[in-house]
Amino acid sequence: MAAPQDVHVRICNQEIVKFDLEVKALIQDIRDCSGPLSELTELNTKVKEKFQQLKQRIQELEQSAREQDKESEKQLLLQEVENHKKQMLSNQTSWRKANLTCKLAIDNLEKAELLQGGDSLRQRKTTKESLAQTSSSITESLMGISRMMSQQVQQSEEAMQTLVSSSRTLLDANEEFKSMSGTIQLGRKLITKYNRRELTDKLLIFLALALFLATVLYIVKKRLFPFL
């Protein structure tokens, strides 16, 4: 049975992967965004929230790594933490580049609209719909993976709760066993003491009976054979 600490480490890793995929999906949406700026701002707000959640899980994993008893496991987890940090920095770089690309595309489209007028608006609408379809397809795929990871996280949490409940049951059973052991020891001592006392009582009865018989024989002897 896995230790609660191991289950927590596995949950952290799964959530880190989930948030990483969600960040990548949002960055792809930013790359495909052709405006307006309000849509870009909304996407950036979502990315910031996901980065905050990702950073928090990485910090939790790092704390769990430092609490490991075995040095080998500690170093292995710290290496995983370092890899996650590098991946997060890479995502942040991609995020900045995606913003630059999106803003440049918005600027170019606005300039084209001024030059081409109505034709540009129709072309922009068609381009935006095509990009939206592509983005939607990519986002659905990544979110599908994210949902799968969420289910795994939930299953791990349920396993952890079951583990904690089982641990409590074992502790209660251990306490009951200790109590029963004490009772058995006390009963054994009482039985031993009773057996000894019973033997002593039998010996005393035997001696009293022997003394009684000796007295009777002595009296009979004196009555029947006084000359002896």
Swiss-Prot record:
Topological domains annotated Lumenal: 221-228
Transmembrane found in the keyword field: yes
Membrane topology: Single-pass type IV membrane protein
Transmembrane segments: 200-220
GO molecular function, one term: SNAP receptor activity
Cytoplasmic side: 1-199
Post-translational modification: Polyubiquitinated. 'Lys-63'-linked polyubiquitination by RNF185 increases the interaction with the autophagy receptor SQSTM1. Undergoes 'Lys-29'- and 'Lys-63'-linked polyubiquitination by RNF186 that may regulate BNIP1 localization to the mitochondrion.
Annotated localization: Endoplasmic reticulum membrane; Mitochondrion membrane
Keywords in alphabetical order: Apoptosis, Coiled coil, Endoplasmic reticulum, ER-Golgi transport, Membrane, Mitochondrion, Protein transport, Transmembrane, Transmembrane helix, Transport, Ubl conjugation
The keyword Phosphoprotein is assigned to this record: no
GO biological process assignments: apoptotic process; apoptotic process in response to mitochondrial fragmentation; endoplasmic reticulum membrane fusion; endoplasmic reticulum organization; protein transport; response to activity; response to oxygen-glucose deprivation; response to starvation
GO cellular component terms attached to this protein's record: COPI-coated vesicle; cytoplasm; endoplasmic reticulum; endoplasmic reticulum membrane; intracellular membrane-bounded organelle; mitochondrial outer membrane; nuclear envelope; SNARE complex
Coiled coil (residue ranges): 37-90
InterPro entries on file: Sec20, Sec20_C
Functional summary from the UniProt entry: As part of a SNARE complex may be involved in endoplasmic reticulum membranes fusion and be required for the maintenance of endoplasmic reticulum organization. Also plays a role in apoptosis. It is for instance required for endoplasmic reticulum stress-induced apoptosis. As a substrate of RNF185 interacting with SQSTM1, might also be involved in mitochondrial autophagy.
Family, per entry: Belongs to the SEC20 family.
Complexes and interactors: Component of a SNARE complex consisting of STX18, USE1L, BNIP1/SEC20L and SEC22B. Interacts directly with STX18, RINT1/TIP20L and NAPA. Interacts with ZW10 through RINT1. Interacts with BCL2. Interacts with RNF186. Interacts with RNF185. Interacts with SQSTM1; increased by 'Lys-63'-linked polyubiquitination of BNIP1.
PANTHER family per UniProt: BNIP1-RELATED (PTHR12825), VESICLE TRANSPORT PROTEIN SEC20 (PTHR12825:SF0)
Name of this protein: Vesicle transport protein SEC20
